Structure formats: C-alpha cells, structure tokens
C-alpha cells in the first residue's frame, strides 16, 4: 500500500519540486506556489506526495473550497479542489496517480479538478465526469467533477 504524505513547506520540498519542473508542463508547476508559501516545516501545507525511497515521485495540491461560491455541485456545499496532480516519468503507470486520487476521495467530499495534457482518460477511469463547458465559469479550463455518490467502490468512512 502506498503512503500519501502531507508535504512540508520547506527548502527540501522546494528542491524536490524542481525535479518536477524539469519534466512537467509550466501549467503543472507548483514551484511558485511553494515559494510563495514557504514557512519552514509548515504543517498546513496543501501539498501531498508519494515517496519512492527518499525521492518524491508523485504529488498534488488539495484545497478545500467554500461551497458558497460553488458553481459545480447542486447543493452549494464545500468541495475539494484537486490541482496539479503529477507523477514523474519512470514512475508512471504504477498506481501513484490513482493512490493520490483515492486519498482525496477518502475525505468523502465532492472534488473538482482540471483535465490537462491528454489526461481525460485517467479522470474517466477515476469515475470523474466532465462538466459541460461554460465560457464565463470555466475560463479555458476543462473541469471534471466527482461526488461521493458517484463512486460505488468506497463506502462511507473507508480510506484509500
């Protein structure tokens, strides 16, 4: 079983994020996000990752969003924004991305994400649904959503 860790906001994590920037697309870069929030060992980090040995090989950011401004789910409820999921080349197709998504699902809250870089098939496999595009709301993004009721694989209280 893979262990998902909340990433500390510190200079070590900053160095690890630089590895992702070498491989990833600019839109997936979290380096600037981390630099803007750097407080040594901040425990309220929105960043989560998976290590293989001592090397960070997969990561995402996960934010809780106030449902009062929620245009994606029927009951204006709080939801999670799953952002910038990325797995380093050489570690892809080993279940790391799925493990991060399952971790986010374990909070049993609706989730919104943005499909990038030909990742629609991945989100479909994770039981996310594409949202009908609305130019004013989505502003060039390709939102996908998941609600706990959409996924029969996990039961209430079960964690990934």
From Swiss-Prot:
Listed PROSITE patterns: GNAT (PS51186)
Which InterPro entries does the record associate with it? Acyl_CoA_acyltransferase, GNAT_dom, YlbP
The lineage is:
Bacteria, Bacillati, Bacillota, Bacilli, Bacillales
This entry's Gene Ontology molecular function terms read: acyltransferase activity, transferring groups other than amino-acyl groups
Determine the domain of life of the protein's source: Bacteria
Q: Which residues form the N-acetyltransferase domain?
A: 7-151
What is the species of this protein? Answer: Bacillus velezensis (strain DSM 23117 / BGSC 10A6 / LMG 26770 / FZB42) (Bacillus amyloliquefaciens subsp. plantarum)
Entries under HAMAP family matching the protein: Acetyltransf_YlbP
Protein name as annotated: Uncharacterized N-acetyltransferase RBAM_014960
Span of the signal peptide: none
The catalytic activity of this protein is classed by the Enzyme Commission as 2.3.1.-
What UniProt keywords apply to this chain's record, in alphabetical order? Acyltransferase, Transferase
Q: Name one Pfam family in it.
A: Acetyltransf_1
**Main enzyme class:** transferase
């Amino acid at each position: 079983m893979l262990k998902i860790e909340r990433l500390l906001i510190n200079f070590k994590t900053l160095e690890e994020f630089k590895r992702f920037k070498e491989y990833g697309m600019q839109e997936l870069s979290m380096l600037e996000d981390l630099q803007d929030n750097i407080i040594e060992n901040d425990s309220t980090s929105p960043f989560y990752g998976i290590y293989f040995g001592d090397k960070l090989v997969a990561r995402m950011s996960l934010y809780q969003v106030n449902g009062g401004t929620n245009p994606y789910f029927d009951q204006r409820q709080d939801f999670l924004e799953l952002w910038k999921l990325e797995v380093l080349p050489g570690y892809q197709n080993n279940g790391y991305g799925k493990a991060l998504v399952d971790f986010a699902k374990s909070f049993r809250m609706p989730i919104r994400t943005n499909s990038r870089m030909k990742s629609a098939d991945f989100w479909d496999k994770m039981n996310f649904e594409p949202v009908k595009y609305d130019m004013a709301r989505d502003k060039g993004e390709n939102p996908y959503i998941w609600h706990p009721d959409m996924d029969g694989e996990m039961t209430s209280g079960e964690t990934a």
